């Protein structure tokens, strides 16, 4: 039986505290995570059938972190058309990543975001949810990239300029 790639979303959630930039990361703990559980990751998840990609991103971030997204870079630039009962949007994410082999056949749309609210420390899909300094994340990415969920590495390298 023919199988198809699953569309997903991920969020690079930024914050600045005392003139220092942080992003939100968590430890992966998915029901179907297998060997990827225990890796550092961005909040992410699957897009439901006919779900608006920006609403999917908001839902996944809320479910996994407790935070509410207040801004998604590029959302205001989306193009929308509604003709004969069909609604279509076009958008530009920060980074698109496709897994070509391995455990997951995924196309991941990663967006830059801001969020607010009470941060959870653990959910049924993630643990150790926390803000990490950009410089600390750069060190992990350079020295131990195997600790980061593979589908998030390219977007993080782009974001961090490495």
Where does each model-flagged region fall?
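Short, charged/polar surface micro-motifs in flexible loops or helix N-caps
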Residues: 18-19, 31-32, 48, 78-81, ...
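Active-site donor-binding loop signature of nucleotide-sugar glycosyltransferases
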Residues: 28, 44, 134
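N-terminal strand-loop-strand
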Residues: 1-41, 69
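The catalytic Nudix box helix
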Residues: 42-86
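Nudix hydrolase/Nudix homology domain
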Residues: 32-33, 37-39, 89-95, 103-162
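Short loop/turn microsegments at loop-to-beta-strand junctions
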Residues: 8-9, 52, 127
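Short Gly/Pro-enriched turn/cap motifs at secondary-structure boundaries
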Residues: 1-3, 99-103
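Short secondary-structure capping micro-motifs at structural edges
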Residues: 58, 95-100
């Amino acid at each position: 039986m023919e199988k198809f790639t699953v569309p997903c979303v991920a969020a690079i959630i930024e914050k600045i505290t005392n003139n220092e930039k942080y992003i939100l990361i968590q430890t992966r703990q998915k029901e179907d995570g297998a060997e990827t559980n225990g890796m550092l990751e961005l909040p992410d998840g699957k897009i439901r059938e006919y779900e608006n990609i920006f609403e999917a991103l908001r839902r996944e971030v809320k479910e996994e972190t407790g935070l509410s997204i207040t801004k998604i870079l590029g959302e205001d630039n989306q193009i929308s058309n509604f003709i004969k009962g069909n609604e279509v949007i076009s958008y530009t994410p920060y980074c698109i990543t496709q897994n070509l082999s391995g455990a997951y056949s995924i196309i991941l749309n990663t967006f830059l975001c801001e969020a607010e609210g009470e941060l959870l420390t653990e959910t049924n899909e993630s643990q150790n949810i926390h803000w990490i300094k950009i410089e600390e994340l750069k060190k992990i990415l350079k020295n131990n990239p195997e600790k980061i969920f593979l589908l998030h590495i390219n977007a993080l390298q782009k974001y961090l300029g490495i």
